[in-house]
């Protein structure tokens, strides 16, 4: 919604890196602010997931089943199939729904930044670490952490994540003492993780820990019967936002889609 700060030509990393860290911290803090409980439940419940096709309803049924447990969940499917929507619904219909739901896309960060974002760091632990920083695991304590595109995570960080799953502990960058955490992990990927394991890019032990309960989300091309329902819902939502009267969608337009 605007500029956070600015840099000038010639600024070095000693200024740029802390500035980026502060901007990311503010964005993340804004992202975990609590919404009104009623609004949150309506927006993120399974009832908000639109579709009537058999593959989608089967995925929803599985997700409802696992929501009442506390086991890790692995969501698989192509980009755009709604993996984060499912993760939010699982969280908000679980016993952890009073805690935070925090999410991160593992493909959006370098290994070093991703480690800092997830596990946090102590001041002075590396260049630009001017103050202590909470990691997402700390933010998600007693709640749920969603690790999107887990297949992009560096193999070194996979070992730290495995430790959390095995012991409920992690070590911040710059610390030697482990921190205990009570958090549910939901991961998602658009990759074929068994193939990544064979290629040496993903840990087999981590895969089995994450995939205690695995749900595959079908792409829209495999559920064409949902196209009209989704289109009408999007048109209705846009009409309300633009304060227009409700619009209808022609059969010819749906057939084209």
State what each model feature region is.
Residues 9-78:
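Flexible nucleotide-interacting loop at or near the entrance of a catalytic core
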Residues 141-144, 160, 181-186, 203:
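Loop/turn-to-beta-strand initiation segments
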Residues 18, 27-28, 94-99, 174-184, ...:
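Nucleotide-binding/hydrolysis machinery
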Residues 11, 48, 62-127, 138-154, ...:
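Conserved post-Walker A coupling segment in P-loop NTPases
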Residues 36, 59, 81, 104, ...:
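Conserved RecA-like P-loop NTPase ATPase core
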Residues 8-17, 22, 111, 115, ...:
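Conserved two-component signaling phosphotransfer/partner-docking surface
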Residues 12, 21, 55, 105, ...:
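Receiver (REC) domain switch/active-site region of two-component response regulators
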């Amino acid at each position: 919604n605007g500029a956070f700060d600015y840099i000038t030509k010639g600024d070095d990393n000693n200024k740029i890196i802390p500035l980026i860290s502060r901007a990311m911290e503010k964005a993340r803090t804004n992202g975990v602010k609590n919404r009104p409980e009623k609004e949150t439940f309506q927006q993120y419940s399974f009832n908000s997931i639109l579709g009537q096709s058999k593959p989608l309803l089967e995925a929803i049924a599985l997700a409802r089943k696992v929501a009442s447990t506390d086991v890790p969940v692995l969501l698989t499917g192509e980009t755009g199939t709604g993996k984060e929507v499912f993760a939010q619904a699982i969280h908000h219909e679980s016993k952890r729904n009073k805690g935070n739901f925090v999410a991160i896309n593992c493909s959006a960060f370098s290994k070093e930044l991703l480690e800092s974002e997830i596990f946090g760091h102590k001041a002075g632990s590396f260049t630009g670490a001017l103050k202590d920083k909470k990691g997402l695991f700390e933010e998600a304590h007693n709640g749920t952490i969603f690790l999107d595109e887990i297949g992009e995570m560096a193999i070194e960080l996979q070992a730290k994540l495995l430790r959390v799953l095995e012991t409920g502990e992690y070590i911040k960058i710059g610390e030697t003492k482990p921190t205990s955490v009570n958090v549910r992990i939901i991961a998602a990927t658009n990759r074929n993780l068994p193939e990544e394991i064979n290629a040496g890019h993903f840990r087999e032990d981590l895969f089995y820990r994450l995939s205690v309960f695995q749900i595959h989300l079908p792409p829209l091309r495999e559920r064409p019967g949902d196209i009209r329902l989704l289109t009408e819902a999007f048109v209705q939502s846009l009409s309300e936002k633009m304060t227009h009267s409700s619009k209808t969608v022609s059969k010819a337009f749906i057939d084209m889609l």
